[in-house]
């Protein structure tokens, strides 16, 4: 089936119980390396078996793949029908793709934010959250994902500011080990109900060990992805 070569897949499938049996949910992505003026993704933190370990500057988690663990039946559910790349695939592969409304409730109620996508987004957010041109180019207010306090590696962030040339400070990779994203069931500060979400903390990119912000991702009741920064 050629569609397997047209989508990229997350490295972390997860099981759900459907009609008394077990099915695995796999997050599938459409990608491109030809999005005009788009910054290429930093993929250095991804697991080696992630489908996103490649050059791209466009990515959308447009499909949820559900695989029956008993008989191997595979269903492709579209959760982002506005994705232009997926729209083209649907014209080619006909009835292979199903609407998200056809997804069993046992599956849709357990969808989670895709881990590999979150790793890429948080790896780049520390610089691109800035909306002031001067701050963006100086890098003085940039953030980085916090390092793992249990790591034996030196350093405190996945990026740091290189001031070798004072006139041209640069954000460069650090060799420390960043905190892995982690899923949790918790209540966000502005809400009354608990949510199942994925999160990651940020510190200043200059190496200070001060919690500056944390980023969370979750899937809402309509299967759409939602990101928040606190």
Annotated model-derived regions:
Residues 4-230:
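Soluble extracytoplasmic regions of secretory-pathway and membrane proteins
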């Amino acid at each position: 089936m050629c569609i397997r070569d047209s989508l990229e897949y997350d490295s972390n499938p997860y099981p759900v119980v459907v009609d008394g049996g077990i099915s695995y949910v796999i997050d599938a992505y459409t990608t491109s390396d030809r999005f005009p003026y788009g910054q290429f993704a930093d993929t250095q933190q991804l697991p080696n078996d992630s489908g996103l370990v490649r050059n791209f500057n466009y990515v959308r988690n447009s499909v949820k793949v559900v695989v029956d663990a008993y008989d191997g039946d595979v269903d492709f559910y579209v959760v982002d029908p506005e994705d232009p790349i997926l729209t083209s695939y649907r014209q080619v592969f006909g009835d292979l793709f199903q609407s998200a409304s056809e997804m069993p409730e046992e599956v849709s109620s357990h969808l989670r934010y895709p881990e590999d996508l979150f790793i890429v987004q948080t790896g780049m957010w520390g610089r691109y959250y800035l909306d002031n041109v001067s701050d963006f180019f100086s890098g003085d207010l940039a953030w980085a994902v916090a390092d793992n306090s249990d790591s034996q590696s030196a350093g405190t962030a996945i990026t740091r500011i290189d001031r070798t040339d004072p006139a041209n400070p640069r954000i460069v990779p650090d060799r420390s080990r960043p905190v892995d994203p982690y899923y949790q069931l918790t209540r966000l500060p502005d809400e009354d109900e608990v949510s199942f979400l994925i999160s990651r903390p940020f510190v200043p990119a200059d190496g200070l060990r001060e919690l500056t912000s944390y980023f969370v991702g979750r899937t809402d009741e309509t299967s759409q992805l939602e990101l928040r920064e606190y």
